[in-house]
Amino acid sequence: MRQKAMEKFRKGYLPVETVTNTDSVNAHAKNNMLLDCAIKELIPSKAKKAEKELLSKLINMLVSTNQHQIANFSGGAIQIDDSGLVKTAVGVVSLKSIHEARKTLDKLSNLDVNKNEQDFIDSLNHYLMLIPQKVNHSRGWHLSFFRQHSFAQQYEFLEQLEKSVEMYEDILAQEQKNKSSSNSDDNQPKVFNTQLKLVTNKKVIDKIKSYFDDNKNAAHGSSKLQLLNVYEIVGLYNDEQLIAFDKLAKEKGNVQEYWHGSRNYNLLSILKNGLIIPKSNSFNVTGRMFGDGVYFSNQSTKSLNYSQGYWDRGRGIDNNCFMFLADVIMGKAYEASHKQAKLDCQNTRKTRVYPVKGYDSVIARGGVKNVTHSGDICSLSNDEMIVFDLRQIKLKYLCEFGFGD
C-alpha cells in the first residue's frame, strides 16, 4: 500500500491537509469585505469625487493583483475570495499552517534530494499538504519542483500568504467589534491607519519627476515608464514614531531621499503595516546580498525594475507599477566597496558581515567590487543603500508609473 501511495506521489498526486471548515470561518465575513474596508479607510473622507474615483480604481487593482498572484503562483490551488479569505478547495489557509510550512521549507532547504530522497519526498509532501500548489504530473516531478519554484520564491510566497491571512483576520475582527460598538465611524478602530492623498502641487510633482529622470538608467527596461501620479502617505506612522524619527535624524544625521521598489501585490500590506525586514532563511531573496535589511537606491530605475518585475520574471511583469519615496537616516554609513572592508572580512573570517558594529547603514556602490554579507566579492551595476533598523525609515510618497496615454 505504501509503495503504491509513493508511486502516486512521484507522479504528482497529493493529499491536501484540511485546516478547518471554510463555512465556519467565513460565517461573519461578507462579500467585498477587504475591498470595502480598504476603500473606506485609505481614501480621505474629504477627497473630491475625481480623486476618490482614482483612488478607488487604484485600491481595486491592488486587491485584485494580490488575489491573482496567489492563484497564479499556486496554479489555482489557493484562492482569495472577495471577503479576503485565503482558502483551498477543501479548507482555509491558516497562520498555523503557514508557520508549519515555513519550518518544513527550512528542513527541505537543508536536504539533498539525491542523498536523502525519501526524507525529501516526505517533507515536500507535507509542505504541499499545507500549502497546495499545482505540480507537474510527470514521473520524478519532485526532482524538478524547486527548479521551477525556487526556495526563495517559496519563502516569498509564504510571506505573501501570511500577510494576506493576517489582513483578513484583522478586518474580520474589526467587523465584529464594529457590530458590538456604539461608537461613530470616526472613533471605530481601523485596519488601515494610512490614507493616500493625491498630490496636486506642481512643485512637488516636478521635483519628484526630476529626481526620477535625473537618476534613471536608460539600459533598464523600466526607464521607458513615466510618472503618472504621486500619492502622499498620511497616518502610516503615529505621533510617537514621527517624534522618534526626528530625534534619531538629529542624533545620526545624513538623512537622504531614496527609492524603494515593491511588487504591486505587496503594497496593501505595506500601507497597512509599513515596511518589514524579511525573516532570515537559508536562501537569499532578491536584493538580500548585504544582509537582512531594507534596501533602497538613489538610482530610480534600479528600484523600479524590481517593482515592474524585471528581477522577478517568474511572477510576471507589471507595467503599471509603484515605488515609494522615503526619507532614510543613513547616519554613519559603511562602504561595502572600501578596501578595508575586504581586509576586515579576511582578518575576522566573517561569513555574516552586515550590519557592521559602529555603523548605521551600508552603501554598496555600482561599478566597483563590494564585500557581500557572505564575505564574497561581487560587482554591482547600481548603488544600493541598506538600513537594518525600521526606525530609520519614513515613507513619504507612493509614486505610480506606467506608459501613460
Where are these regions (language model features)?
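Segments that shape or occlude catalytic/ligand-binding pockets
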Residues: 3-14, 176, 195-197, 243-405
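Alpha-helix boundary/capping residues
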Residues: 5, 62, 108, 124, ...
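Residues that form generic nucleotide/phosphate-binding pockets
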Residues: 8, 57, 61, 211, ...
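Eukaryotic extended interaction platforms
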Residues: 13-193
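Helix N-terminus capping/helix-initiation residues
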Residues: 44, 94, 147, 201-202, ...
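Hydrophobic transmembrane signal anchors and adjacent membrane-proximal interface regions, especially
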Residues: 78-80, 86, 93, 143, ...
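Internal glycine-rich, Lys/Arg-flanked active-site/core loops of soluble domains
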Residues: 150-290
